[in-house]
Design a protein with these regions (language model features):
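PLP-dependent amino-acid enzyme catalytic core
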Residues: 1-128
């Protein structure tokens, strides 16, 4: 399949959780992964694109405004989109643990993906 056809297919289809393999599997052609990269996924990314008709109507002129509802990602955050790659590459590099400074979404995502990878996770909570 040509590059343009594959790109068009990716952006014109709506994935469902039943047949979705996660972001890395879907976009690996354009990502820094190889056959040696362990794909650590929680099936992130198959979130709905929703039209916000009230805003579209206010703008007018046939403009349609859409939002991505990333609250439906595995840990409830868009952070899962990047964490799948971060933990996959850390695992590939031989890391046994990950660490982050966070009070919220990053730490939840890092802990979930590290657990899936069989890695330890450490969260540093900033003072204040």
């Amino acid at each position: 399949m040509s590059f343009s056809k594959k790109l068009k297919q990716l952006f014109t289809s709506t994935p469902s959780q039943n047949n979705w393999d996660g972001l890395i599997e879907t976009y690996k052609t354009w990502l820094p992964v190889s056959n040696k990269t362990p794909i650590i996924t929680l099936k992130e990314g198959a979130t709905p694109l929703l039209e916000v008709k009230s805003i579209s109507n206010r703008i007018g002129n046939g403009v349609k405004v859409f939002v991505k509802y990333d609250g439906l990602n595995p840990t409830g955050s868009f952070k899962d989109r990047g964490m799948t790659m971060a933990i996959s590459k850390a695992k590939e590099a031989g890391c046994e643990a990950v660490i982050c400074a966070s009070t919220g979404n990053t730490s939840a995502s890092a802990a979930a993906y590290a657990s899936k990878a069989g890695m330890k996770s450490f969260v540093i909570i900033p003072d204040g």
